[in-house]
C-alpha cells in the first residue's frame, strides 16, 4: 500500500494511505501532478485536528464507489444520513463547520454533503428564533423589517 504525507496548516505531517487521501479530488490531482515524488503535500487551509478527522472519514469511506452525476439529484433531495456518519458528525459546532470548510477545500463532495445535511437537520422544523439560538446568531432586523419579511413570504408558511 502506497502512502502519502500531508502537511497540515499548523505544520504537522500526517502519513496516510494513498487510496484514502485520494478521496479528496484536490489531493488526487496534486498527486497526479507530482508523479512519483515522495514530497509532502501541503494542506494550508486545514489544521491537524480537522485533517485527522477528515482522514478518519475518508478511511471509513475509502471503498465507497465514486459519486456519479446521476445520484446527485436524489442525494440532494434527502437529508438522510447513515448511522456511522451521524455518529461521526456528533461534534461541537466549530468542528462541524471546520469539517465542512475542509471538505469543500479538499473537494470531498460526499463529506461536504454529510456536513451540510447535518446542519440542515439542525435547522429543520425550527423557527427563526430557535435557529438564531442554535447557531448563536444576532437578530439585526427591526420589528418593522421582520413584519415586512413575514408578509413577503406568507406563501412559504402555507
UniProtKB/Swiss-Prot annotation:
PANTHER family reported for this sequence: SKP1 (PTHR11165)
Positions of the UniProt region annotated as Interaction with the F-box domain of F-box proteins: 100-158
Function: Essential component of the SCF (SKP1-CUL1-F-box protein) E3 ubiquitin ligase complexes, which mediate the ubiquitination and subsequent proteasomal degradation of target proteins. Controls sulfur metabolite repression, probably by mediating the inactivation or degradation of the metR transcription factor.
Subunit structure as annotated in this protein's UniProt entry: Component of the SCF (SKP1-CUL1-F-box protein) E3 ubiquitin ligase complexes.
Gene3D superfamilies reported in the protein's UniProt record: Potassium Channel Kv1.1, Chain A
Source taxon at top rank: Eukaryota
Family from the record: Belongs to the SKP1 family.
Pfam families xrefs: Skp1, Skp1_POZ
Upper lineage: Eukaryota, Fungi, Dikarya, Ascomycota, Pezizomycotina
Protein name, as recorded: E3 ubiquitin ligase complex SCF subunit sconC
GO cellular component, one term: single-stranded DNA-dependent ATP-dependent DNA helicase complex
Keywords: Ubl conjugation pathway
GO molecular function: cullin family protein binding; DNA replication origin binding; glutathione binding; ubiquitin protein ligase activity
GO terms under biological process: exit from mitosis; G1/S transition of mitotic cell cycle; G2/M transition of mitotic cell cycle; kinetochore assembly; mitotic cell cycle; mitotic nuclear membrane biogenesis; negative regulation of cytoplasmic translation; negative regulation of mitotic metaphase/anaphase transition
Protein encoded by which gene: sconC
Pathway where this protein functions: Protein modification; protein ubiquitination
Amino acid at each position: 500500500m502506497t502512502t502519502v504525507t500531508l502537511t497540515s496548516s499548523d505544520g504537522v505531517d500526517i502519513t496516510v494511505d494513498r487510496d484514502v487521501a485520494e478521496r479528496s479530488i484536490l489531493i488526487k490531482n496534486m498527486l497526479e501532478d507530482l508523479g512519483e515524488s515522495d514530497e509532502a503535500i501541503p494542506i494550508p487551509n486545514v489544521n491537524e485536528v480537522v485533517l485527522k478527522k477528515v482522514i478518519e472519514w475518508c478511511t471509513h469511506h475509502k471503498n465507497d464507489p465514486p459519486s456519479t452525476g446521476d445520484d446527485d439529484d436524489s442525494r440532494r433531495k434527502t437529508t438522510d444520513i447513515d448511522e456511522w456518519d451521524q455518529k461521526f458528525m456528533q461534534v461541537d459546532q466549530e468542528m462541524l463547520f471546520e469539517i465542512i470548510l475542509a471538505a469543500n477545500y479538499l473537494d470531498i463532495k460526499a463529506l461536504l454533503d454529510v456536513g451540510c445535511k447535518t446542519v440542515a437537520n439542525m435547522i429543520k422544523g425550527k423557527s427563526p428564533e430557535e435557529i438564531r439560538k442554535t447557531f448563536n446568531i444576532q437578530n439585526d432586523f427591526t420589528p418593522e423589517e421582520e413584519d415586512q419579511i413575514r408578509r413577503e413570504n406568507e406563501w412559504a408558511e402555507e
